[in-house]
Amino acid sequence: MAFGVDLVTFYHPSFWGVSDYAQIAALAGRDLPAFWNKLFDAVRDSGVRGVETTFSPFHWRDAVAAFGSAEAVATALTARGLTLASGFLVDLDREADLASAAAQARILAEARDYARFIRACGGGVMVVGMPCRRTFLLEPVRVVDLAMAASLADFINRLGIETAREGVRLALHTEAHSVFCAPRDIDLFMLLTDPRYVHFCPDSAHIALEGGDPVAVAARHQERICIAHWKDATAGMPIDTVIDAGIHDRHKPFFCPMGEGIVAWDRWADLIRARGDAMWSILELDAAPDPVAAIRAGHAYAGSLTC
């Protein structure tokens, strides 16, 4: 089984020798080549082979700016025995009005460019995060009903067609507190999207945060899984958790090292293994203070399940 890491794992001030997130961005801005070389060296030292790019300063455009071209990024990876496994598209949750034609056109254009980068660097999957829900009972209350889901699913289908034209599969990621993480919501969007163009990236910890059984949910859509995020959680989060710009930080206290939480890892590993050894399994540890040690530990634990 092939293992990689999402670069969000390195989004911790301690790793960079600074005191907050803003200083990480400032450090990257001062010397992008040094920033990305340190990043790729750390991935190499962690023992996994695959890289998943994500939001800035770990964005694919940052990588191109650091090395000069997509081909140069690929060369930098190959020199370290690495490859691009996938790229995470964050744009859907960052548009104020995702239903607008202008916003959709921007995202489609970004996805097209991103897919070309992914292919140039040896990858074949674009993972996409879905828009957030609203806080429970926050006025005006919004529900995820058929009309809302159908409209968004139509755009997701178009997005999947766009990336498929570039040879890249689009996979929906189960981000907690998004419209695609509670078991019913996952089932709904899997029903409404076309399986030829829209695939599935189950994230074990995020499904658990929403009160779901990661294995049961993933098993219902096993044939559409083309990549998976491996992460553990201690418990589900309260239904009235505030959903705002700080939601990702609220998730972090509920995450834990693999094997110390509620994910049924033996069953999860069996399910993912059944999809084939060539599929990427991404270790995503959300801002680890010592990311290299954390990835090594997670990789060793996952390896003990899959050998």
Stretch-by-stretch model annotation:
Residues 1-121, 299-307:
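N-terminal pre-domain/capping segments
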Residues 3-9, 51-53, 84-88, 126-128, ...:
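Hydrophobic faces of well-ordered beta-strands that scaffold small-molecule active sites
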Residues 18, 51, 153-256, 262:
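Acidic/histidine-rich catalytic cores of soluble enzymes
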Residues 25-34, 145-151, 250-262:
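A short acidic, glycine-rich active-site loop
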Residues 30-33, 54-69, 92-98, 103-107, ...:
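Acidic-and-aromatic substrate-binding clefts and catalytic sites of carbohydrate-active enzymes
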Residues 46, 121, 196, 219, ...:
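Structured loop/turn residues at beta-strand edges in well-structured enzyme cores
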